């Protein structure tokens, strides 16, 4: 895009007020990091789901650490992430196709994505009105219906020791919200000033 002149053209359109915001879509943390280094994007469409975050699936590009580092950087730099592939093309919703061999619900997948740093919205695929009605039910779903802590019972071995803020380890004997503490810690390590105040 840089050598072709497309980026310069988009920048010109933004300066003229024709383009209000510049965003991009990618499945690769490395590609997005390079775009962030240019300081031009304000929005990112990125594939986030438990399968991809744990290197399971066609678009599972980058390690868990690389992906989390990208989410944290986007949050720190004010680049909103719109999530695509939240259900991994439906694979996570069926035990037969799930890389975990257990099905998750749509609500669990949506909440999982929303809980990642930098995420501002999830764009689930809608095929018909029934899908739309079901997805809108997320807004009325109970915390139990959104809870994805079951992931802690079947995530791959490579994920051990990496907190994904699911609170599967709860209840803490000391009454601490372990997921939230780890989230603030991760944000603080990434340089988020607000998180440092909380941590």
Label the model's feature ranges.
Residues 65-199:
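Structured C-terminal cap/extension of enzyme domains
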Residues 1-82, 87:
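Glycine/proline-rich, positively charged
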């Amino acid at each position: 895009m840089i050598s072709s002149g497309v980026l310069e053209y988009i920048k010109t359109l933004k300066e003229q007020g024709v383009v209000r915001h510049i965003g991009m879509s990618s499945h690769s943390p490395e590609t997005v990091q390079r775009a962030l280094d240019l300081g031009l994007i304000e929005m990112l469409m990125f594939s986030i789901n438990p399968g991809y975050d744990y290197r399971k699936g066609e678009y599972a590009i980058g390690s868990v650490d690389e992906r989390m580092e990208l989410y944290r950087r986007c949050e720190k730099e004010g680049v909103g992430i719109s999530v695509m592939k939240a259900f991994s093309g439906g694979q996570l919703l069926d035990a037969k196709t799930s890389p975990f061999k257990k099905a998750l619900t749509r609500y669990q997948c949506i909440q999982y994505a929303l809980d990642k740093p930098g995420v501002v919205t999830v764009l689930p695929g809608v095929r018909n009105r029934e899908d739309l009605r079901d997805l809108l039910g997320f807004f009325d779903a109970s915390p139990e219906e959104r809870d994805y802590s079951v992931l802690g019972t079947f995530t791959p071995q490579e994920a051990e020791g990496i907190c994904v803020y699911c609170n599967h380890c709860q209840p803490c004997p000391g009454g601490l919200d372990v997921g939230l503490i780890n989230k603030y810690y991760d944000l603080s390590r990434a340089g988020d000033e607000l998180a440092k105040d909380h941590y």
